[in-house]
């Protein structure tokens, strides 16, 4: 069932700004939101995107018995403190949810309004599940461009996380359908991403920034990090500011 945003109520938490902004856009045939069994989904170019924090992949990531993933290692370092983290690029919300499961408090930004609504719906569903409720409640989600937020907020954070979303390379292996849509819908251009790191440094919003990059990519904004955590296909550039 295709629906207009004016008829959409994601558990009574949609704001009027989003409603007015997207009422027409959600009616496009190649890109629209729809409800299926009370779950909000995105149809885009004959593909479907649905975000669920109760799926097996997420549950495995947040299992205390699972080895800490790279993003957790990069952001926590040797600290055992519970951090306030600004996630500037929410995407599918997996890193955000993983960090919140570690006890950290997240303010998460997503500029794409489709992804924002999918994430909001997913968080609200997680809040209804006993073993996920506490995690979901540590996450605050805002629909805004990251550069705009950083330049206008008076808040500060223990760490800022940046995961620039670039279109996949033509030679890269096929990725999951959800990631394919994310690459097409949620990526920023290189100038915006470079400006983001520059603005983080300029505003002194945090003493630490962590930037996720493809393993062989150049430094964001040509700025050499203080340290790095490398994996097989990507790395985390860590900036002490």
Curated annotation (Swiss-Prot):
Predominant localisation class: cytoplasm
Catalytic activity: guanosine(1516) in 16S rRNA + S-adenosyl-L-methionine = N(2)-methylguanosine(1516) in 16S rRNA + S-adenosyl-L-homocysteine + H(+)
Keyword S-adenosyl-L-methionine: yes
Binding site for S-adenosyl-L-methionine: 94-95, 163
Keywords: Cytoplasm, Methyltransferase, rRNA processing, S-adenosyl-L-methionine, Transferase
Enzyme Commission numbers on file: 2.1.1.242
MF terms (GO), sorted A to Z: rRNA (guanine-N2-)-methyltransferase activity
Domain of life: Bacteria
Functional description taken from the UniProt entry: Specifically methylates the guanosine in position 1516 of 16S rRNA.
Family: Belongs to the methyltransferase superfamily. RsmJ family.
Protein name according to UniProt: Ribosomal RNA small subunit methyltransferase J
Native source species: Francisella tularensis subsp. holarctica (strain LVS)
Organismal lineage: Bacteria, Pseudomonadati, Pseudomonadota, Gammaproteobacteria, Thiotrichales
Gene responsible for this protein: rsmJ
